[in-house]
Every structure is written in C-alpha cells, then in structure tokens.
A protein has these predicted regions:
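N-terminal secretory targeting modules
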Residues: 1-114, 118-124
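Loop/turn elements at helix/coil->beta-strand transitions in domains of secreted/extracellular proteins
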Residues: 107-110, 133, 173-178, 210-216, ...
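Extracytoplasmic/secreted cell-surface and envelope-processing proteins
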Residues: 122, 187-192, 224-232, 270-274
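Active-site segments of SGNH/GDSL-like serine hydrolases
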Residues: 181-185, 207-240
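Generic structural signal for well-ordered alpha-helices
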Residues: 199-204, 243, 247
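Substrate-gating cap/lid alpha-helix
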Residues: 224-265, 286, 291
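Histidine-centered active-site loop/cap adjacent to the catalytic His
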Residues: 280-307
Length: 307
C-alpha cells in the first residue's frame, strides 16, 4: 500500500480511538454522578456531640446559627391541636411544676434561660423585653450548645461576644431562676447513665456557683413529622425518653432538698398525631417559631416555682 493511502487510514483510526475514549469518560462521569446523588436518609450526617470552641464572634441579631431560626407567618393566638398529655414515664411528685396563676412579666424577667439552639431562637424571634440583645439567654458559640460540653465551652449572654465559662458567669450574675433546656442533639446517642451524668454536671455547676438559684429543668421540645422522618436519629420517642431521664434527675435533686424542678413543656407543643404542629416550627421542624416560644413563656409564667 502506498504511503499516501496509509496516512488517512492512520488519522481516521486515531480520531476514532479518541472518540471512543471521550465517550467512555462521559459515561463514567454520568455513572459516578448517579451513584453519589443525594437521596433522603443518606445525605444527612449525624450531628456531633461536640460544640466547637468559639473561633468567631457569636451571631448578633442580624446573623443566624447554622440552622435557620426565622419565624413562619402564623398568628401567636392561633389555636392548634395539642395532646395535653404528660410526657411518658415522667415520675409524679411535687418536683413537677403545677399550674398556678400567671406570675406575670415581672416574674419572667427574673429568669435566665440556658440552652442549645432551641433556646437561642428566643433572640431572633425577639420574645423577651430586650429582644435580640437579651442577656436573659445563655448559649454557646454560633447559638449551639451540646449537653456534654456545657460546663467546658464558653457561654455567651445574648448578642455579647465575650464568652465565659458557665460557672464563672453564674458566680457573677447569680440569677434568681434558671431554666435549662438541653439534650436534643444527644437524645438518641447517649444511654441514661451518660445523659444523666452530663445533666447532673450542669446542675452541680449551677448550685456550686449560685447556691440560691432555683432551677427549672425544662423538657426537650418535640419535632415535626418531616424532621422526625428525615432525621431518624432525632425523633419524638427518643426525645420523650430523654425527658423522662431529665425528670428523674430533677426528682433526685428535689428530694435531696435542692430547689430543682421539672417543667413538661413537651406535651404542650405535641399535636394529637404525636408530632409538633408545623406552625410551631420556624420551618425546619426542630426550632420553635415565635408562636411556640410565646406558648412556652406563658407556660413558665403559669407554672411558677414555689417561693
């Protein structure tokens, strides 16, 4: 065969080979994308029990934590179905706060709230007198605070960027009443012994730093159905179980002569279907809306701690 005829054949073969390689690469990329595409239940990572040490200022009223805390458009006076039944397995006794006359805003203003992102939501929802700057709200960096790290991580008051250890802060402020709402992020990952030991460490820190402070161990709030189903590690049965542990912890301190009480706000935010009604959530199924916070605050005022 003449050289002049060989060259076109070689070039055609090379072009054909390059086309085959290109098509193979395209099919490989498409296959890889399909295999790794997010699907419900597989793209959610399990939350860490660690709460990072602050590396940047705590969010101000114009900033928000990782999870959105904006309130849906719902009237705070809207009536929604609630179960009205106490959380399962909560022991009965005088340590469980009973309904009283409304103690009023003066009573509410004497309270300090310590909690995770479900408490931090009080700031952007502006449900307290000082709104987004309220020093009544104690939280961790970025608005989050995990139960195992409450006594070792820095705590921030309101929009302040000055963090202090919990014991240090309480020694200075010595609040009359402290409402603790903690445990939602670890309600499924810790057994009763470990959960209770972390919770007791928080209470012991409060009592040693401010002995006259009355402590309200507030129940963990329920979640909406969509959150329960999409985050299988965060569900109402586990939350109810953890609330029973919190109740037992409060009972132990109360029976030893300490002014430690339990408040069941869980059942007040639980719908008849076993989930938190969606208007009580800010839209993510976990954090509360302004309407829900107003219910919680109203419950605190109408379940006054004994003098």
């Amino acid at each position: 065969m003449k050289p002049s005829k060989i060259k076109p054949i070689v070039f055609s073969a090379i072009a054909f080979l390059l086309m085959i390689i290109t098509l193979a690469c395209v099919f490989s990329l498409v296959f890889f994308h399909i295999q790794h595409k997010d699907t419900p239940g597989t793209s959610q990572s399990r939350p860490s029990t660690a709460d990072p040490t602050p590396s940047s200022p705590v969010p101000t009223s114009s900033e928000t934590p990782t999870e959105p805390l904006s309130s849906p458009s719902v009237s705070s006076s809207e009536t929604l179905p609630v179960s009205g039944e106490p959380s399962p397995s909560i022991p009965e006794g005088d340590f469980v706060l009973k309904k009283t006359e409304d103690a009023g805003l003066d009573y509410q203003n004497r309270i300090v709230f310590l909690g995770d992102s479900t408490t931090y939501g009080m700031l952007p929802n502006m449900v307290l007198p000082d709104k987004a700057d309220s020093k009544q709200v104690l939280h961790g960096a970025g608005g989050t605070l995990s139960l195992p790290n409450v006594t070792t991580n820095l705590i921030y008051a309101g929009s302040s960027t000055e963090g202090k250890l919990l014991g240090e802060y309480l020694s200075e402020v010595k609040p009359e009443i402290l409402v603790i709402t903690l445990g939602v992020g670890v309600s499924d990952s810790l057994n009763e012994s470990r959960f209770s030991s972390y919770y007791k460490l928080v209470i012991d820190t409060v009592l040693s730093s401010s002995p006259n402070t009355k402590i309200i161990c507030n129940s963990i709030y329920p979640v909406c159905q969509a959150r329960d189903e999409s985050y299988q590690h965060l569900n109402n049965p586990d939350i109810a179980k953890a609330n029973a542990w919190i109740g037992k912890v409060a009972q132990g301190y109360y029976e030893s002569g300490k002014k430690v009480y339990y408040l069941d706000s869980y059942s007040l935010l639980l719908g008849s279907d076993g989930y938190m009604p969606s208007p009580y959530s800010n839209g993510d199924g976990l954090h509360l809306s302004k309407a829900a916070f107003e219910i919680v605050l109203g419950t605190i005022r109408t379940h006054k701690v004994p003098d």
